[in-house]
């Protein structure tokens, strides 16, 4: 009996390694050291010594990990695997920049039922695309074939991001104060949270198939809308951070993921402060309205589960809010004043 008889194909793994090599190497810069396929990836922190010393006197490394959750089940239903890798990168790097740091490199883990090199290459293409968007290197990864654990065409994935921030420029929300402005950056739909509820409502209770096109979605299918990739905010947010280096301009940063605005915005504010959110300051995207109507799901539950169209929030000094928003718009972001910081909390206030 062989390992292949037991369901693990080492040759398929070797073919996958060859297929994904160009996808991995397109994310590399001269800061990546060592040959492709080594036991561990190496990344040079001080590649440009002069530039490094100019920006980092006390560099602090940042690490985070996250996954995509049951959004993968929508990908299985549509048999489309080239975007969930973008989600995987986004969920990590959008978290990482919340302390003011920049992503350096990314690692991934895939657990699969049957290793199909072509299908795995689609997943890695998405991860590679996400790394390019986030300007970080795909430094390495692991793919484990476990036929006793997963169904043949199913898999799970996890990502790990490492970044760096100058110690004196760490953003932790401690200098936020009443009167500061909360700037919202628009999401591109559901992103990667709330899929347990979204699938239950749309695919089970409402009975939609992934190919169905409800009129509420303006021509998009249910599957297309649910599989829309998570927006990566790295380049835009870092551009603002580099332009406004004075610490008391950008006070706090929040990635709006599971728990929505109520579960994420208070996390970055000190005790005694909250944000008064203007509910009418943005138009809630159609996908959220459809979920709410078909559930039905009440407003409070929607706000506590989904991003509701707000993917990221910056808390900034009031005198700088308008120029920061102008800069973000030139970078391609849709943004608006979400509300203002005031005394109170820990819950958000709604206007």
Regions found by a protein language model. Give the residues of each.
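N-terminal amphipathic/basic leader segments beginning at the initiator methionine
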Residues: 1-33
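Glycine-/charge-enriched secondary-structure boundary and capping motifs
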Residues: 2-6, 119-134, 150-155, 209, ...
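Hydrophobic face of alpha-helices
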Residues: 17, 121-124, 195
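Short, acidic (Asp/Glu-rich) active-site segment that either coordinates a divalent metal cofactor
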Residues: 65, 156, 169-223, 262
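Short, acidic Gly/Pro/Ser/Thr-rich loop/turn segments
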Residues: 13, 49-50, 68-71, 166-169, ...
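Glycine-rich phosphate/pyrophosphate-binding loop regions near the starts of catalytic domains
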Residues: 22-188
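Glycine-rich beta-alpha junction loops
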Residues: 40, 163-165, 182, 187-191, ...
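Residue-level signature of catalytic and energy-coupling elements of molecular machines
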Residues: 9, 66, 179, 255, ...
């Amino acid at each position: 009996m062989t390992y292949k008889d037991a369901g693990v194909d080492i040759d398929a793994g070797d073919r996958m390694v060859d297929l994904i090599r160009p996808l991995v190497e397109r994310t590399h810069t001269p800061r990546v050291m060592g040959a492709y396929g080594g036991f561990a990836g190496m990344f040079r922190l001080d590649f440009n010594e002069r530039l490094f010393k100019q920006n980092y006197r006390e560099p602090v490394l940042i690490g985070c990990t996250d996954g995509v959750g049951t959004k993968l089940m929508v990908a299985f239903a549509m048999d489309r695997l080239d975007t969930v890798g973008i989600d995987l990168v986004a969920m990590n790097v959008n978290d990482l920049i919340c302390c003011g740091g920049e992503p350096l490199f990314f690692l991934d883990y895939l657990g699969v039922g049957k290793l199909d090199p072509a299908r795995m290459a689609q997943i890695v293409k998405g991860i590679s695309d996400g790394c390019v968007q986030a300007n970080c290197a795909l430094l390495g990864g692991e793919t484990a074939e476990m036929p006793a654990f997963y169904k043949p065409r199913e898999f799970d994935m996890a990502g790990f991001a490492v970044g760096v921030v100058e110690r004196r420029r760490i953003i932790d929300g401690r200098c936020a104060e009443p009167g500061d402005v909360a700037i919202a950056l628009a999401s591109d739909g559901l992103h990667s949270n709330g899929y347990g509820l979204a699938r239950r409502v749309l695919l089970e209770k409402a009975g939609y198939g992934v190919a169905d096109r409800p009129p509420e979605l303006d021509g998009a299918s249910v599957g297309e809308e649910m599989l829309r990739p998570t927006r990566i905010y790295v380049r835009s947010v870092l551009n603002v951070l580099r332009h406004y280096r004075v610490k008391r301009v950008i006070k706090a940063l929040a990635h709006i993921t599971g728990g929505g605005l109520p579960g994420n915005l208070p996390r970055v504010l000190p005790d005694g402060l909250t944000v008064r959110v203007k509910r009418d300051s943005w138009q809630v995207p159609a996908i959220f309205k459809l979920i709410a109507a078909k559930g039905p799901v009440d407003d409070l539950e929607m706000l506590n589960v989904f991003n509701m169209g707000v993917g990221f929030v910056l808390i900034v000094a009031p005198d700088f809010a308008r120029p920061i928003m102008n800069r973000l718009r030139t970078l391609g972001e849709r943004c608006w004043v979400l509300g203002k910081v005031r005394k109170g909390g820990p819950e958000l206030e709604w206007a």
